[in-house]
Amino acid sequence: MYIKDKYNMTKNENIFLAKRNIIGSIYNSVKLEGLDITFPETYAIYYKARLEAVNVADVNTVLNLKHAWKYVLCNIDKPITLEYILDVHNEVAKDEAIAWGVLRNGGVGISGTDYRPPIPTKEEVIKKLKEFERISGCTERSVERMLWMMKKQLFWDGNKRTAMLIANKDMISHGKGIITIPEKDIELFGELLSKFYSYDEKDDLKAFIFEKGIDGIVFDKEISHEEPVLE
């Protein structure tokens, strides 16, 4: 299945959308990881409020995502290289994983499936990233790279979060929207992702992402308007 582009915005319009929805994107990401946290708590943590009832590790996860999003938006025009991905993971998994900002160097398992991803090598990852750049459609390229990163498990932890941020970097820089899995659809996404891990079947997963997981704005180009002013 080939995913066509769902939205066509300018880069500045897409950055405006990403900034406006950043807390929602972070909330969906932490719920995807199974964290017991509410949207108001996520909002409060983002704005550095002190919360006694929230686990310290959960607070760290939210703040790491805040910093990772800041890195992506501040470096939106950089090419997606292994070094770029390592920098994003360094923000995502800081003080959470065995190591962060480096490729995994040991074996891991994935809950819910018998699939065991092989240990990644630098040469293999660089080669694969170059192959993705040959895909002309931005949404197709972003989703394919994201799913590959999730299944490959490049890191000890934070793989889904990092993969989705890299996908969003590509999507935003080309004005194609934002990928985020709404809380109400996380269970189905998990089932389809497990099926992909186990059997390498991804058509249903890609169709789901297109229908439920890509957000954007359709602008009336007939109306004259200025580019959104970025903070």
Label each residue range with its predicted role:
Residues 1-231:
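FIC/Doc superfamily catalytic core
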